[in-house]
Curated annotation (Swiss-Prot):
Assembly mode: Homotetramer.
Domain of life where this protein originates: Bacteria
Database matches in SUPFAM superfamilies: S-adenosyl-L-methionine-dependent methyltransferases
Entry's Gene Ontology molecular function annotations: methyltransferase activity; transferase activity, transferring alkyl or aryl (other than methyl) groups
Biological process (GO), any one: tRNA wobble uridine modification
Protein name per its UniProtKB record: tRNA U34 carboxymethyltransferase
Catalytic activity: carboxy-S-adenosyl-L-methionine + 5-hydroxyuridine(34) in tRNA = 5-carboxymethoxyuridine(34) in tRNA + S-adenosyl-L-homocysteine + H(+)
Enzyme type, top EC level: transferase
Name of one Pfam family that matches: Methyltransf_9
Enzyme Commission number(s): 2.5.1.-
Organism: Pseudomonas syringae pv. tomato (strain ATCC BAA-871 / DC3000)
Function: Catalyzes carboxymethyl transfer from carboxy-S-adenosyl-L-methionine (Cx-SAM) to 5-hydroxyuridine (ho5U) to form 5-carboxymethoxyuridine (cmo5U) at position 34 in tRNAs.
Family according to the record: Belongs to the class I-like SAM-binding methyltransferase superfamily. CmoB family.
Amino acid sequence: MIDLAPLVRRLAGTPLAEWANGLQAQLDTKMSKGHGDLQRWQSALDALPALQPEKVDLTDSFTLETECDGETRTVLRKALLGLSPWRKGPFNVFGVHIDTEWRSDWKWSRVSPHLDLKGKRVLDVGCGNGYYQWRMLGAGADSVIGVDPNWLFFCQFQAMQRYLPDLPAWHLPFALEDLPANLEGFDTVFSMGVLYHRKSPIDHLLALKDCLVKGGELVMETLVIPGDVHQVLVPEDRYAQMRNVWFLPSVPALELWMRRAGFTDVRCVDVSHTTVEEQRSTEWMRFQSLGDYLDPNDHSKTVEGLPAPMRAVIVGRKP
């Protein structure tokens, strides 16, 4: 059982205290329904060797270090491979380098210089395996709660939390819709790589705003296209082989959406083309990746002939 008592204590006396008090029951109900692969992933977690990090770096990377012999490292590597595929990372765990599909550290290096997370209560929506949560703590956040309904990501987070049990990061296997309306308790809310999967992007922005305290900041990272305020791409069917992609706005259009949703001080802090160096297949993620989704003769287009992935980071404030 995952014990959320430390989270309840952490949020006592905050606007999130009432919500926190009901989380254990909500989590237990969700876990009782389970997932077909959950037992296999739990076996991988149970196989993790008991190690105590002597050095932890979450500021410049995710790196745990301690004295570890080759045999123990082999056991560790096998257990972590049992939680494949690993999408977000990389993680350096006692000499085992988890070379994930995404170089998420590159994205974090583009996002983090524009933020001040010191002392902030943070919510990461669609947090994946929690890689960014750990980096947010490294940037000084007071506490970080991630929500993502994917059970494998939940287990990957648990693997890292085994070695960092006292740090104020929690992963809840919930969707944003599972959170109560008008939480209004987080200083900073992240939504990275989620908006284009939403059929109603404005509703998503409004739901994120509901999670923020007054004066709180939204960090929105999503796929965009070139163009003016009137340009929005709605794929006919798939985009980069993904079926569940709905709206890819231009940066000016996304800024307008955020203003219409009630955010102020809206500004774009980064626009980057995704490269096959940043997203690729590895030993830890053996399935197809970005290189398979681009036109082999023209990497400026997807296999469907649409503009290749370009991602923007927009920040805005709740008045």
